[in-house]
């Protein structure tokens, strides 16, 4: 399966969030709060999937307290472009058991 994970355009299997993924989520948290007009006291990345495009899309399931989760899609440009991380999309009102899919 390793070789399949490197195919451009394909989503990886869900993986446990790493400190790097938490850092990515933290960096786009203000963008999400602005778009949803909410403040998230808790913002813990749980799992993620990635997709290699002209950069990388990260799909991250974030626990925001209680039984509430959000799914966020973050785009990270190629390293030489030095663009900031960008929140591309989000899905609110998710649960722990909702599948993290491409959106």
From Swiss-Prot:
It is found in: Cytoplasm. GO terms for molecular function: cysteine-type endopeptidase inhibitor activity. A motif (Secondary area of contact) lies at residues 51-55. The modification Blocked amino end (Met) is found at residue 1. SUPFAM superfamilies: Cystatin/monellin. InterPro entries: Cystatin_dom (IPR000010), Cystatin_sf (IPR046350), Prot_inh_cystat_CS (IPR018073), Prot_inh_stefin (IPR001713). The record marks 9 as: Reactive site. GO terms for cellular component: cytosol. Keywords: Cytoplasm, Protease inhibitor, Thiol protease inhibitor. Belongs to the cystatin family. PANTHER family: CYSTATIN FAMILY MEMBER, CYSTATIN-A. This is Leukocyte cysteine proteinase inhibitor 1. It comes from Sus scrofa (Pig).
């Amino acid at each position: 399966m390793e070789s399949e994970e490197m195919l451009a355009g394909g989503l990886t299997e869900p993986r446990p969030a790493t400190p790097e993924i938490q850092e990515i989520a933290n960096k786009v948290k203000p963008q999400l709060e602005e778009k949803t007009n909410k403040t998230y006291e808790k913002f813990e990345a749980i799992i993620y999937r990635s997709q290699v495009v002209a950069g990388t899309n990260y799909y991250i399931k974030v626990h925001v307290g209680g039984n509430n989760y959000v799914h966020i899609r973050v785009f990270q440009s190629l390293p030489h472009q030095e663009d900031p991380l960008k929140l591309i999309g989000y899905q609110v009102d998710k649960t722990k058991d909702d599948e993290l899919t491409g959106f």
